[in-house]
Every structure is written in structure tokens, then in C-alpha cells.
């Protein structure tokens, strides 16, 4: 067994020990730790920024949107601290009993929420994920092992150290938050195989990262993130509403997973509405790639290829298709989407209900932007990711998604008779 594997197993054992302690903490103790972490981020902002500067220097040749996600400022650190404080205000899911009842044998059965144990996070060069994950796992009573992108290594190490020291200063386990400092793929693969130490693995990043984790991990995985999201403009759509929703969903933050990537429009309204929607998008710098029917209506569009329908652009690009029916739109969406967020724009109630029932996605909208798929917008507070799978958690994952169920049964000598 090589040294790296031994180191990861040592981290796993330390995380398990920390998780046992975290599971016994009161909500007050957890909130005390969170407030200490928030204060430490602000106190040590200069140290964090110095580390981030080293990462930015090494990443200067990378795309601007990548560098922007990597960059930290005092304002962004203040936002991180505010986010941690906000987590402290959220209800503690482990302090609640979901339901309780007495069965025919006189047993009192209570269904409670308990921490998952040790959460592993594999994510790309987004230092804010380090803080978000630490805060959410701590509040829900879990330890976390973090493995961020190599481009953010100095930033992540500085952040993790600040958070660990803040916990230790309050007499709380510093191993509640651990960071893997070897950014190699080999170590990431070994992390995916830490069965017995990591209870669940959550990848956050692009399609390639998520696919690699899902295919290679032997640890249970919650699949998150990739968002090939569609907006379908129905034959009964209001033009003004369609323009506003499509532009918001595509333009506001094109690099995030809840941005719309595809526009489907019913043939009955395409001649009237598509030129207006297309102009609004193009006025915001969006490159449109259309099928033959869309390009016949808006000749300035580029030709869409078969690959376009399955591509998450994360950029100011949108593919457009004209469909003859809602059934065709639903069939296309279910064939090409990533089960993230899908929307219909319509004034027809029956069409809206058909869309809600037949589209397979974590979140399905009627007359609203896909950009609302977010823990804060759903009232969950911060989120650790957006699950696109069906088991355990689906959609924006807040604190409750980082817990599981335990049944506590109280008796007074009952034995089963048959």
C-alpha cells in the first residue's frame, strides 16, 4: 500500500472520529462553531487573499470566466462569511423528529434525521465551495473531506486552515474539515474508493468531472450539477413573458448550471415570436444555433449540429429548435436533458400539467425562469449542490439532504409473537 493511500485512510479515520463527535453536538455548539468560522474568514482575509493571488498568477492564461470563479476579493470573502452566518440561522435538521407514532404492540416509534457521517467533495477551482461545504456539513453534523481543483490549491488550503483553526479554538474537532492537498487524478481516484471511510461522495463541476466520479467511484455518489436546461415556448405563450424568461434564463449568468441552453418553440407561434426572442438574445450577445426551420425564420442563426442538442455551453450560446407539438418538445427534452431544470411558457392549463407530469427533471417550471433552481431561492438557505439523480436527494440540496433517517423505538418489554 503506497503512502498516498495510507494518508487518505488516515484522513478517513480522523473524519470518522470527528463525525462521531459532531453527531453529538447541540445546535448551539454547532452555531458557535459556525460563527467562529465566519469571524475567522474576515480576520484572516489578507492571508486568504495572498494565497489566492498565487493561484491567480498561475492561472493568468486560463479563460476569463474560469479566472473570475477562482478570484477572491475582500468583498467575496465577506460574502462567504455572511453565508456561514446564514447557515447558523437555519433550522438544524438533526434536532427534529420527523414523525412519531405508537404501533399495535405499544412501541413508540420515532423517525429522526441523523447525519450521513463523512461527506467527500470533489470539485473544480471554486474556493467558495470549500467554505459552503464546510459550513453545511458542519451544521448537519457531518465531517467533510475536500478535494478541490489544482488551480485553487493555495486558496483552498488557506481557507481550510482558517476554518480548522477556528473550530479548534472553540474546542471542536478540527478534523471536521479536511483538505486533500495532492491535486493529482490518482489521488482523486483513490478518494473515490474510500469505502468504509467516506459515506457519500458529492462531485461539483462540469460534465466531465461528474461523469468521471459517477463511473469510477465505489463510494456512493450523489450526482450533481450538469445542466442542459430547456425552455419550451408553447403555442399558447405570451410573447412578452417568453422574451423576459428566455433572456433571463440564458443571459443573467450563462456559466451556471441552471442557465437555459436550449430553446424549443411551437411552430404555430414561431414565425411571430421567434424573431423577437432571437433579437432580444442577440442584443445581449448570444450566439444562436438553429435547426433548419429556425434558420428559415431567423437566417442570422448558425446551423445547429447533432452535438449541440447534448451540449451544456456555460456560455452565451443557445440552440433553437422548432417543434410541431408539445409531445415532440417533451420527447426531445427527455432525450437530451441532464434531468436538471426544464420550463414551459404557456397560458394553457392542460399543456402546463402535461409538461409538469411528463418531463423528467429534478425541477420543472411553468412560466418561470430555470434560474430559480437554487437553495436560497427555494428557501433552503445555502446548498451543497443540485442533485440530478432520483435516489436519496433530488434538486437543490440543503441541510436535510445531508442527513438520513434513523428510527428510535421505545418499548417496555415487548416481544414479537408471530
Curated annotation (Swiss-Prot):
Catalytic activity: L-glutamate 5-semialdehyde + phosphate + NADP(+) = L-glutamyl 5-phosphate + NADPH + H(+)
GO cellular component, one term: cytoplasm
UniProt keywords, alphabetically: Amino-acid biosynthesis, Cytoplasm, NADP, Oxidoreductase, Proline biosynthesis
Cytoplasm recorded as keyword: yes
Pfam family, one: Aldedh
Pathway where it operates: Amino-acid biosynthesis; L-proline biosynthesis; L-glutamate 5-semialdehyde from L-glutamate: step 2/2
Location(s) in or outside the cell: Cytoplasm
EC number annotated for this UniProt entry: 1.2.1.41
One Gene Ontology term of the molecular function aspect: glutamate-5-semialdehyde dehydrogenase activity
Superkingdom as given in the UniProt entry: Bacteria
Any one of the GO BP annotations: L-proline biosynthetic process
Physiological role: Catalyzes the NADPH-dependent reduction of L-glutamate 5-phosphate into L-glutamate 5-semialdehyde and phosphate. The product spontaneously undergoes cyclization to form 1-pyrroline-5-carboxylate.
Family indicated by similarity: Belongs to the gamma-glutamyl phosphate reductase family.
HAMAP family: ProA
PANTHER family named in the record: DELTA-1-PYRROLINE-5-CARBOXYLATE SYNTHASE (PTHR11063:SF8), GLUTAMATE SEMIALDEHYDE DEHYDROGENASE (PTHR11063)
Name the record gives this protein: Gamma-glutamyl phosphate reductase
